[in-house]
Design a protein with these regions (language model features):
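Short, solvent-exposed loop/turn segments enriched in Ser/Thr/Gly
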Residues: 13-20, 117-123
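Short acidic/proline- and small/hydrophobic-mixed sequence motifs that coincide with surface turns
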Residues: 28-33, 47-48, 77, 131-136, ...
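Short beta-strand/loop motifs in extracellular/secreted proteins, especially
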Residues: 32-36, 135-139, 180-182
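Intrinsically disordered, low-complexity Pro/Gly/Ser/Thr-rich segments with frequent PxxP/GP/PP motifs
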Residues: 48-75, 151-177
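Terminal connector regions
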Residues: 71-112, 175-190
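Short, solvent-exposed interaction modules
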Residues: 99-138, 144
Length: 190
């Protein structure tokens, strides 16, 4: 895990925003369905909640970067830790159809703050430069203040993007977090 941030949203829920990098060291096979555990603890070290999510396919030798958010319902965590992805023998697949992270590119074309809403709207597009269609693509927004990650969010584009194709997206993120720059990342997610 590169970074995490904990904030309260407009509903006074405790939202954990994480940014991850994951590498497939295997150069012959894609890896899929790696399980990553998250543990949230309070200031006394007591575990408030544990959860997990599954990594999607990572092409041979590739590194992916993405955001993940989780709402902690059992109190405000003061620390977050993650486990290394766990895999089984069935996690390793033929690499045919696997898209490398650098074969998807995303850009933000507009950031706006609609009147009456407590959200910023990030509009943009993602281009698939791979020779394979991207069946599902995760778009991650990483917000920074003075170069430090202060929040992140993501959405899943479930409409396939054909090879050489482009798709538009809009992501809404709470205005409760002050930022002065952002990154947008497209990650193959199938």
């Amino acid at each position: 895990m590169e970074a995490y941030n904990i904030c309260s949203n407009v509903k006074n829920e405790h939202v954990v925003s994480c940014v991850f990098s994951a590498t497939n060291p295997n150069t012959a096979y894609s890896v899929t369905r790696g399980r990553v555990g998250l543990t949230m603890k309070d200031s006394a070290g007591k575990t408030l909640e544990t959860t997990y999510f599954m990594l999607q396919t990572i092409a041979p030798g590739d590194t992916v970067r993405f955001a993940y958010t989780y709402t902690c319902k059992n109190g405000r965590p003061s620390s977050v830790s993650c486990s290394q992805p766990s895999t089984t023998s069935s996690s390793f697949k033929d690499p045919t159809g696997a898209i490398k992270a650098n074969e998807l590119s995303a850009e933000i074309t507009e950031v706006s703050s609609p009147d009456g809403l407590n959200y910023n709207r990030f509009s943009g597009s993602v281009t698939n430069k791979s020779r394979y269609p991207s069946e599902c693509t995760q778009i991650s927004i990483i917000l920074k203040k003075n170069g430090k990650i202060v929040s992140s969010d993501f959405l899943l584009l479930t409409i396939p993007i054909p090879s050489g194709g482009k798709s538009n997206f809009t992501l809404y993120h709470t205005k409760d977090v002050s930022f002065d720059s952002y990154e947008v990342i497209a990650t193959p997610w199938f």
